[in-house]
Amino acid sequence: MKVSEFDYELPSELIAQEPVEPRDASRLMVLHRKTQRIEHRIFREIIEYLEPGDLLVLNVSKVIPARLYARKKTGASIEILLIERLEEGIWKCLVRPGQKVKKGTELVIDEDLSAVCLGRGEDGTRILKFQPQDDRLIFEKGRTPLPPYIKNEVPLERYQTVYAKEEGSVAAPTAGLHFTPELIEKLKKKGVQFAEVVLHVGIGTFRPVKVEEVEKHKMHEEFYQVTKETIKKLRETRERGNRIVAVGTTTVRTLETIARLPEQEEYVGKTDLFIYPPFEFKLVDALITNFHLPRSTLLMLVAAFAGKDFVMEAYREAVKRRYRFFSFGDAMLIL
């Protein structure tokens, strides 16, 4: 399958530069897979599509302030993006411009914090040892790691879901950005159940698909965790005959990863599961997601879930109706 089959025309003004206020006022496109029908709603109206006993599964990973600005002793500016914590104060990072950072290169963030490059990691990353080796201090100096297509500065808390709690992501699981505490409360009152997973969004988010054929793309591993409590809720939902509704593609990848492993009480590990058409979904019955970049692995996952032709038609419709796209954009519910 060609990556070009997942391309579409997107006018740049439809790339959302800031989030909607309140969060649940964003638009919601509803895709009905059985009837191939499309509806246009507001996100807070999602409550009408969820039944008592349905299970909403949230990724509670929290975005870290992963972007740092440093200088070499020569005065050259270097941008650092924290990717993965290896141990306290030692991080796998992306650095720009990369050719200027070699083993032994010293980087000064400010008078309180510096770093030295210990060497190269895979896929162009660098291993940086910070001085002092204090993650709290590193985070104090860091800024929101917004994607490159967002030109505005946005405070970190607004690039965070209201339920985020496990630090580790370098990009937000954006489908969850539309939920407010009030909407969650209303859903609970209706009898909708909630469960949590963790998947720390990593370097894969920043890496475009560079191959021509979908099958040749390799996903980067990302850390995930599913607790005993969540496993119990998933099992009970299945037994009741209710739906498991994944909030975001990261939740889908976590659930479909554990669905392919031997049964356990709880799961923790790394996943490089790449979901593209055709794919047999074993746990996820419905999906809440945003509108994704052309040719991206996220769009391929959505196409695998709802059917490629239907999804590409929905995206053309979204462009025509001036939906807002990407991280701070509008949402889609696939039933």
Swiss-Prot record:
Pfam families: Queuosine_synth. It is found in: Cytoplasm. Its main location: cytoplasm. GO terms for molecular function: S-adenosylmethionine:tRNA ribosyltransferase-isomerase activity. The keyword Ribonucleoprotein does not apply. Keywords: Cytoplasm, Queuosine biosynthesis, S-adenosyl-L-methionine, Transferase. It is an enzyme of class 2 (transferase). Its EC number is 2.4.99.17. GO terms for cellular component: cytoplasm. The keyword Transferase applies. It catalyses: 7-aminomethyl-7-carbaguanosine(34) in tRNA + S-adenosyl-L-methionine = epoxyqueuosine(34) in tRNA + adenine + L-methionine + 2 H(+). GO terms for biological process: queuosine biosynthetic process; tRNA wobble guanine modification. Pathway: tRNA modification; tRNA-queuosine biosynthesis. Belongs to the QueA family. Transfers and isomerizes the ribose moiety from AdoMet to the 7-aminomethyl group of 7-deazaguanine (preQ1-tRNA) to give epoxyqueuosine (oQ-tRNA). NCBIfam families: PRK00147.1 (NF001140), queA (TIGR00113). Monomer. This is S-adenosylmethionine:tRNA ribosyltransferase-isomerase. It comes from Thermotoga petrophila (strain ATCC BAA-488 / DSM 13995 / JCM 10881 / RKU-1). The lineage of its organism: Bacteria, Thermotogati, Thermotogota, Thermotogae, Thermotogales.
